[in-house]
Amino acid sequence: MRAIDVKTGMKIPWDVRYSLSLFIFLSSILFLSNGQDYGMPGEDGGGGAEPPPEMAHCNGIFMSYNFGSREREYPHVKNVTAQSWAFKSTAMIVNAGREELKGWQMFIGFRHKELIVSATGATPMDGDYPLDASNGTTFVGSPNMDLKTSIETAGDFTQISANIEITGTLFGVSKAVTPMPRTIKLTNDGWECPAAKRKGGSMHVCCKRNPKIKNKIGLKTKFAPRRYGDLNIVYDVLQSFDSNYLAQVTIDNDNPLGRLDRWNLTFEWMRGEFINTMRGAYTHKKDPSECLYSKAGQYYKDLDFSQVMNCQRKPAISDLPPEKKEDNMTGKLPFCCKNGTLLPPIMDPSKSRSMFQLQVFKLPPDLNRTALYPPQHWKIDGVLNPQYKCGPPVRVDPSQFPDPSGLLAVTYAISSWQVVCNITKPKAQASRCCVSFSAFYNNSAVPCNTCACGCNDIDTDTCNANSNPLLLPPDALLVPFDNRTLKAKAWAKQNHMPVPKKLPCPDNCGVSINWHVSTDYKNGWTARLTVFNWRDFAFEDWFVAIDMGKAGPGYENVYSFNGTRVPPSNRTVIFQGLPGMNYLVGQVNGTNPLRDPPVPGKQQSVISFTKKNIKGLNIPEGDGFPTKLFFNGEECALPKHFPKKSSGHRRGISVSMSFVFATIAAFALMMD
């Protein structure tokens, strides 16, 4: 065998050297081929980690969650439950089935007091960043909202999958524990997911279409089907040019008890857009300097920014007053110019919709007619109305409009997005109105809860924000809280009730409602509803809605208001002022301001109920009081207790028997 000299002085046989060279060559080829793995592309289309092997066995929607890393945050504390950690994790959703998934929604069940600071590739439905995800949160696609199938895209992962890179803060987990979510699942209608499987810092699940739930028969849609919540906003692009487009925003109130007064709408431009002109609404701030010193000012050098409506990233928008409705420049638009009033459709369908238009200018690289992106992070609020929580804009099929020519033709929007907002239940001490209870069988009134509408604006060092309110004589409900102290102390002394050294704080509500049980007899009962306005402005077209629970079907009549049952249960009744009495005036000074307390605006009526066909109704034990009460759509804080019926108080009797007793007594007096 022939040998070859090597510089090191070692002799290697030729066939061994040849084999070694071939091995190195093949290894390099294998290395290069492995570099082009079947990865998950990110936003830039680049490859990512290799998909887990479990995905190969999934015929449906595959989802995974991988915990990445964490780092201890300041301040460093010894208490493990109070220590915060910065963490990074990734989630993935892949359409591994044969059916396109429109408007995907992935729920991640966080459970370690997570605060989500940012996420790429998706948008949380539950609010804006930083987002409290202690009880989990749902992500939706942004910009990739729909997941096509591998079959129709030739396995293009940019169209069948989405990656979510999550950054946030978590609490209360020691170093030895990997903080994983409780679960991950798909929340789209018609899909079901088994329990997620976990291994170390990873978990995955394969969700499949529920065969028992048949797809609703209807028109096929190119984009996600429209959903309907309490408040529905549609963002329609009507005209599109290279550098700008005309959009129309339509707000529909679809909740029978929902309402907005003087609504304020905000959203966030994500790509440097700005509002050039508006019709049907206006922005609260118009500052040309914000435009001049922004990217818009650098690009649009010849544009007169003194005439531009708004260049804020988060503009605040409000409806125009009625006098602007026929204005040629800012009005002349259906459903506009109502001073921000959105009534329930059950009250007035013509006042349950608002509309405005805006001309939006774009910046590079979006300078073409098809580069259309809606603003994100929508929020809407009113003066004394329910709190709404809005989801992200979801692409839907273009809206249809009647042709302006009057012909039997239909005009379509270029693109449409829908934002669904739902009413949230007020948190404790965060309502905007409150309720007090009183009854004919008890001398004391149960006032509104302490700090029912919050105590952020008062000095809680001088009062107790957590104690129960003091019982009051009923006439004390007619005066402001500041004028009740002497009455409350005197009443407590008279009725031998304790008075704490530190008195309870006020309720701090602009509107309060008193519910007084007036009578209770064999076949029915009555109550008196009184609405107090402690604000300095009036409420137009006000309404009160009550849910009477078990007693609701017994509603008979209201004598000074209009009363309407709310279907389908008919346990809720909505009351509104009669014509000419639809204004709840504001608070005014007393006859002598130096001596007399302010006088609230007031509306009052008696309401009658029957006990027919309602078994086991006990008025004093709670059946005679509302289980929920709403003022202008806002759920008001209810007292924690009912007025108690003393054991010595006689039981209620029927009206007919009362009349008989009165007649006998009168006859006896005449005989004397």
Curated annotation (Swiss-Prot):
Q: Where is the protein localized?
A: Cell membrane; Cytoplasm; Vesicle
Disruption outcome:
Gametophytic male sterility due to reduced pollen tube growth and compromised directional ovular guidance cues sensing in the female transmitting tract, thus leading to an abnormal pollen tubes guidance growth toward micropyles. Normal pollen development, hydration and germination. Disrupted apical pectin cap and cellulose microfibrils deposition in pollen tubes resulting in an abnormal cell wall organization.
What InterPro entries does this protein's entry cite? Answer: COB_C (IPR056900), COBRA_pln (IPR006918)
Query: What is the membrane topology here?
Result: Lipid-anchor; GPI-anchor
Record keyword Membrane present: yes
Proregion residues excised on maturation: 647-672
- Per the Swiss-Prot or TrEMBL annotation, the motif Required for processing by the PIG complex, a critical step for apical plasma membrane localization in pollen tubes is positioned at 664-672
Would you indicate the residue range of the signal peptide?
1-35
Query: Which organism does this record belong to?
Result: Arabidopsis thaliana
Q: Keyword annotations for this protein? A: Cell membrane, Cytoplasm, Glycoprotein, GPI-anchor, Lipoprotein, Membrane, Signal
Protein name listed in UniProt: COBRA-like protein 10
Which family does the entry's similarity section mention?
A: Belongs to the COBRA family.
Q: What does this protein do?
A: Involved in the deposition of apical pectin cap and cellulose microfibrils in pollen tubes. Not essential for pollen development, hydration or germination, but required for pollen tubes growth in the female transmitting tract of pistil and toward micropyles, via the perception of ovule guidance cues.
Chief localisation class: membrane
GO terms, biological process = cell wall organization; cellulose microfibril organization; pollen tube growth; pollen tube guidance
Instruction: Please report which positions carry a covalently bound lipid of kind GPI-anchor amidated serine.
Output: 646
Cellular component (GO) terms are: apical plasma membrane; cytoplasm; plasma membrane; pollen tube; side of membrane; vesicle
Please list the residues annotated as glycosylated: 79, 135, 264, 328, 339, 368, 422, 442, 483, 562, 570, 589
- One Pfam family hit: COB_C
